[in-house]
């Protein structure tokens, strides 16, 4: 779910893609199946869900987390969606993986620093390296 400005605002470069790319199926089912197989074979825990992109650079309030859940979001961040929109604009196949660094669950929300978010992401790095190496092969 994109709640940020579209990266396609401005003059379209038709050599790169159509003005209004179809986003009804932004992620490649084949790539998702490959990633799931790799995660399962590597015994890496994963979950599927709906990602919401916001502008940031602030972290969300409890009320915002609640709103994002109501509209169908399972995870929230400030990236990924613009890159997917651009990839689909260029007719590229893609999928997305996110590292969940903190919980926005009502009653479980704790203050978190950017440094703590970076540490959680760094902890997930070996699993992401495994996925990327195997998906490229």
Language model region names:
Residues 1-137:
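Glycine-rich phosphate- or other oxyanion-binding loops that anchor nucleotides, phosphorylated ligands
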